[in-house]
A protein has these predicted regions:
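Charged, glycine-rich active-site and insertion segments that engage polyanionic ligands
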Residues: 1-65, 73, 81-84, 154-157, ...
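Conserved alpha-helical scaffold flanking the Walker A/P-loop in AAA+ ATPase domains
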Residues: 30-36, 106-128, 136, 140-148
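ATP/adenylate-binding site constellation spanning eukaryotic-like Ser/Thr protein kinases
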Residues: 90, 110, 142, 173, ...
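Flexible beta-alpha connector loops of hexameric P-loop NTPases
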Residues: 99-107, 134, 178
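Structural recognition of the conserved hydrophobic beta-strand(s) that form the central parallel beta-sheet
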Residues: 129-132, 145, 156-162
Length: 342
């Protein structure tokens, strides 16, 4: 396995739970397997996943599919090829990830990937490049990757994963076959986690993480559930005007749970928007404007969307030096002024 990431290998969590196949992506796996056996597998795939739904899992599975040493059963999951892909040690698989410094995939990394894919495969078969998340490609890196997609070396498979494919250039998307990995139902997530790790407080943890079971493949569900409950209570109190924005911002900014709390904040806002939309319209299609909820308080949906965008931006910039307490205080003050009674 090689990694075009400034010499750093991809994290060991790149494909958690390979031993338990997510049932909600069974159709996508069947499509890829049929195409491979018929000799019609495209040279590039774009996996559009709901967050934590298993895009990287499917990308790793696709690498196993083409590198399995038992073609009749590919991917068998037991041969040397499959096990090395799973362990992130296969010499013909290159992972492309965002650098820790910039949280972007840079043009130098894409050039390294192109050079690696141009080499002869160690096993005489496929060379695989996995770009995850592809929506971390900066503009220059995306343009460089487009050249590889337009003229791929023979015997290569490029797999891109993205939760926000709209951030990718349309020309890049057009060179890929798209697969959609939907978010699992709560029951599907619980069943998968139970098969993988045994019984646990999976339902409560999935509620906190927004039904993203792959994020729980190695996490402790009880701690996540407790953090989520505390976050929801805090946000409810802020919306009702019974909590101090300054004190709560200082408390949230301390410790290592801030990324999880911000995810809870994002899920809480998403839920508030859905509950205040008078029809089951997808959240991406909700029109901004006031809506009268059951509590009789006119809420501005535009303001809630604005808060949601800022929470997502704060989550994406946690590695950037800034005063997180002040950023949280500004968000909490807006929430208190807005009000969002249940």
């Amino acid at each position: 396995m090689s990694a075009a990431n400034d010499g750093a290998a991809p994290a060991a969590s790149a494909a958690p739970g390979m031993s338990a196949a997510p049932e909600w992506s069974a159709a996508e796996r069947a499509t890829l397997r049929a195409a491979f056996r018929a000799g019609r597998l495209p040279h590039a795939l774009l996996i559009h996943e709901a967050p934590g739904a298993g895009g990287e899992w499917l990308a790793t599975w696709a690498a196993q599919l083409v590198l399995c040493r038992e073609p009749a059963r590919a991917p068998c999951g037991a041969c040397t090829g499959c096990r090395r892909v799973w362990a992130l040690q296969h010499p013909d698989v290159t992972w492309l990830r965002a650098t820790e410094e910039s949280r972007q995939i840079r043009i130098e990394q894409v050039r390294d990937l192109a050079a690696e894919l141009a080499l002869t495969a160690h096993g005489g078969g496929y060379k695989v490049g996995i770009v995850s998340p592809a929506d971390a490609l900066n503009r220059f890196a995306a343009n460089a990757l487009l050249k590889t997609l337009e003229e791929p070396p023979p015997g290569t498979l490029l797999v891109l994963t993205a939760t926000q494919p709209s951030r990718l250039p349309a020309t890049l998307i057009s060179r890929c076959q798209r697969l959609r990995v939907r978010a699992p139902t709560r029951a599907e997530g619980i069943a998968w986690l139970t098969a993988l790790r045994g019984t646990g407080e999976w339902g409560e943890a999935l509620e906190v993480l927004g039904d993203a079971p792959l994020l729980l493949a190695r996490a402790e569900p009880r701690e996540i559930a407790q953090t989520g409950l505390d976050a929801r209570r805090t946000l409810d109190a802020l919306a009702e005007g019974t909590a101090d924005p300054v004190a709560e911002a200082e408390r949230w900014a301390r410790g290592e749970a801030l990324p999880l709390r911000l995810r809870c904040f994002e899920n809480w806002l998403t839920d508030q928007i859905r509950r205040r939309t008078p029809s089951p319209t997808p959240i991406t299609e909700v029109r901004a404007g006031p809506y009268l909820p059951a509590g009789g308080v006119v809420l501005n949906i535009r303001e809630l969307f604005g808060l949601l965008d800022e929470v997502r931006e704060l989550r994406a910039t946690l590695d950037v030096p800034l005063n997180r307490g002040l950023a949280l205080e500004a968000l909490f003050r807006r929430l208190t002024r807005q009000g969002a009674p249940s």
